[in-house]
Swiss-Prot record:
The gene coding this protein: hmgA
The protein's annotated pathway: Amino-acid degradation; L-phenylalanine degradation; acetoacetate and fumarate from L-phenylalanine: step 4/6
Quaternary organization: Hexamer; dimer of trimers.
Organism per entry: Legionella pneumophila (strain Corby)
Catalytic activity: homogentisate + O2 = 4-maleylacetoacetate + H(+)
Source lineage: Bacteria, Pseudomonadati, Pseudomonadota, Gammaproteobacteria, Legionellales
SUPFAM superfamilies associated with the record: RmlC-like cupins
Described purpose of this protein according to its UniProt entry: Involved in the catabolism of homogentisate (2,5-dihydroxyphenylacetate or 2,5-OH-PhAc), a central intermediate in the degradation of phenylalanine and tyrosine. Catalyzes the oxidative ring cleavage of the aromatic ring of homogentisate to yield maleylacetoacetate.
Protein name, UniProt field: Homogentisate 1,2-dioxygenase
GO molecular function, one term: homogentisate 1,2-dioxygenase activity
Record-listed E.C. numbers: 1.13.11.5
Pfam families assigned: HgmA_C (PF04209), HgmA_N (PF20510)
A biological-process GO annotation: tyrosine catabolic process
Annotated homogentisate binding sites: 333, 354
């Protein structure tokens, strides 16, 4: 059961009467609870941008105890050089992932000043262990397995073909439902993700607000030791407290975790000729200070009909102002016949040439242009800042050092 509607002002209570009816912070909260506000923006942001929620908890967060440096870190140093070369990886695995929970199975791929990308792998649930990211919100893009995200606001269920966003500072734990779970994770430290402007598309299309789902209140009232791991200023810290941090009995507000089924995306594409720019596939965006230039765009290439006439239908050859990191959830990406599989990653930074590989080009340039259904789901994290690759990703055996060879079959066919 979920609450519906992107950015709506929701309210939910797990126990009847837990929400105060007429105010935020009464002298004595109902049921002996404590009122606590969680702000996602500055108090004075314009009303339509202002994010906050009021939580009614068994104990306030100040009782969590003292944080100490954690021996493990998820962020890794970047390579010194900014290579102009295109890069690609097969799915990445480490020996540390033989038995691991969500935090232990994170692999830092690349980052920019306000965005970082990881892959996650987990085959072990977090029982009395919790995670929070003070540095930014987290966007989950699973490609295998099923997980449940237990948050301060309630539970989200997540599997391949859906996404979830955990706001900055919200504590959660990951329960692995399948044998193992794999996915991509994007950390956004810029403006919170929101729906893109539709412009001439009109009032409807792309990701519809009513399809975004928010959790109903649910809480843990358990004693014993509970470990909280917190990412703060690029480092991990931990504390051990005598109660669960997921002790919110009721809440109201517009700053909360949410999930979305990508199959509900209303895809816009050409019904005449040419290949529209990939911005028409934007699901969520983090706006920068420059209008029309995003800090982060989350873009998908979903299942769709391809019907363009007298047109090269796959993505065109391109040198881009923006910086692209791509992944694949399922299927076969229409611009890459080989080498790019679910769990894989490619990075094409500013002005790095990219486009269909030779085999894909040959097929698309000569095929009979009948309506064709593409049954795959690829995605892109696009940023205004350069993707800097981590040392561990650059030196990982999964990096395809021969990636550029996929374009070496092209011949000169020019004739006057």
């Amino acid at each position: 059961m979920y609450l519906q509607g992107f950015g709506n002002y929701h309210h939910s209570e797990a126990v009847k009467g837990a929400l105060p009816p007429n105010q935020n912070s009464p002298q004595h909260c109902n049921l002996g609870l404590y009122a606590e506000q969680l702000s996602g923006t500055a108090f004075t942001r314009p009303r339509h941008n202002n994010l906050r929620s009021w939580l009614y908890r068994i104990l306030p967060t100040v009782t969590q105890g003292t944080y100490y440096p954690y021996e493990f870190n998820i962020m890794h140093s970047f390579v010194d050089e900014f290579s102009p070369n295109a890069m690609r990886w097969s799915p990445l695995y480490n020996s540390s992932q033989i038995k691991c929970d969500f935090v232990e199975g994170l692999f830092h791929i690349a980052g920019s000043p306000l965005v970082n990308t990881y892959t996650y792998y987990c085959n072990h649930s977090m029982s009395d262990k919790y995670f929070a990211n003070n540095d930014g919100e987290l966007l989950f893009v699973p490609y295998a397995g099923e997980i449940h995200l237990y948050t301060e606001f309630g539970k989200l269920m997540l599997s391949s073909g859906s996404i979830a966003v955990i706001p900055r500072g919200v504590k959660f734990k990951v329960e692995v439902i399948s044998k193992e779970a794999k996915g991509y994770l994007c950390e956004n430290s810029g403006n919170p993700l929101t729906l893109p402007q539709l412009g001439p598309i009109g009032a409807n299309g792309l990701a519809n607000p009513r399809h975004f789902q928010y959790p109903v209140a649910a809480f843990e009232d358990s004693g014993g030791e509970h470990t909280i791991i917190c990412k703060n200023q690029k480092k991990l810290w931990f504390t051990v407290c005598n109660h669960s941090p997921l002790n919110v009995v009721a809440w109201h507000g517009n700053y909360a975790p949410y999930c979305y089924d990508l199959s509900l995306f209303n895809t816009i594409n050409t019904v005449s000729f040419d290949h529209p720019d990939p911005s028409i596939f934007t699901v969520l965006t983090s706006e920068s200070e420059i209008p029309g230039v995003s800090n982060l765009d989350f873009v998908i290439f979903p299942p769709r009909w391809m019907v363009a006439e007298h047109t090269f239908r796959p993505p065109y050859f391109h040198r881009n102002y923006m910086n692209e990191l791509m992944g694949l959830v399922y299927g076969e990406y229409d611009a890459k016949k080989e080498g790019f599989i679910p769990g894989g990653i490619s990075i094409h930074n500013c002005m790095t040439p990219h486009g269909p590989d030779y085999e894909s080009y040959e097929i698309a340039a000569s095929q009979d242009l009948k309506p064709n259904y593409i049954n795959s789901l690829a995605f892109m994290f696009e940023t205004k800042d350069y993707w800097q690759v981590t040392e561990q990703a650059y030196r990982h055996p999964s990096r395809q050092v021969d990636y550029l060879n996929c374009w070496q079959g092209f011949k000169v066919e020019f004739s006057q």
